[in-house]
Amino acid sequence: MGFFSFFSKEKKETLDKGLSKTKESVFGKIARAIAGKSKVDDEVLDNLEEVLITSDVGVETTLKIIERIEKRAADEKYMNAKELNVILRDEIAALLTENNSDDVDDFETPVAKKPYVIMVVGVNGVGKTTTIGKLAYQFKKAGKSVYLGAADTFRAAAVEQLVIWGERVGVPVIKQKMGADPASVAFDTLSSAVANNADVVLIDTAGRLHNKVGLMNELTKIKNVMKKVVSDAPNEVLLVLDGSTGQNAFEQAKQFTLATEVTAMAVTKLDGTAKGGVVIGISDQFKIPVKYIGLGEGIEDLQVFRKKEFVDSLFGGNA
């Protein structure tokens, strides 16, 4: 890990605050599930299963966790219900480690990839454009030159919002008129970025799910056109999901992974919701790394996802 991987006190406080409702909800339910129990029996496991499912961890992932807890209880003779949080913590941490690549250092990109091209996808309303703006801020803060491409040409609000973010952060935004070909915008953005030796390019795309074939064709066209400028573009396809929607986020992930090759995910709006368990389930089911999490409206509230710190925050004071 590099120098920038240092997890500051401020970042920890933001993470703890952002996950507080999930922590309070989940552990309140777990406390009730094991109240008065002296051992991990079938009733405790059934109650825990219900808690995890209702916390938006997802059925498949929940059953996987329960099976692992049963095995550990048998193998290691953990029969005291008070040990349940320790076991649960271990197994969630293990799942996240299995399904995510190594934690990335703060907002860094491979030096050899220039420009590093990130195509950002997701349905309207999940915080996609805001995430792009916050990423641009963080990349610029890390000393990188950034270009934004307004390829969501079907919504005037999306283009306007990206322009506002560009002005706020101080990075150029490439746009065309409403209804323009999104691939053309992406082409222009990469051309400008290459001409100006930019480090990072973020391409906003339309978030329409009503036509899966249309979505697939549109994203494929954008990719193919970008390759004419940068042969290995996009270097990353980042899917933005709204964590507060719980199970709906699973469906969105399913639709977009069918439409294009998603390489990383950002889960937003985890503050103000008790549905933070969705991060665990989505990571497990789709085997795609969660790279960023959104923990508030502030420009600094988008964080690189760190597995250990995430689990520590959820279980802090409870293990």
Specify the residue positions occupied by each region the protein language model found.
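Switch/coupling subdomain of P-loop NTPase systems
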Residues: 2, 9-15, 20
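Short beta-alpha junctions and helix-cap segments that line functional grooves
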Residues: 3, 104-106, 135, 251-253, ...
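P-loop NTPase catalytic nucleotide-binding module
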Residues: 6-7, 313-319
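Primarily NTPase-proximal linker/entry elements flanking Walker-type ATP/GTP-binding cores
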Residues: 16, 20-151, 158-178, 186-194, ...
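Short hydrophobic/aromatic residue motifs in ordered secondary structure
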Residues: 59-61, 155, 271, 299
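Conserved catalytic-core segment of NTP-binding enzymes
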Residues: 161, 181-196, 211-316
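Short glycine-rich anion-binding loops that position phosphate/pyrophosphate groups of nucleotides
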Residues: 206-208
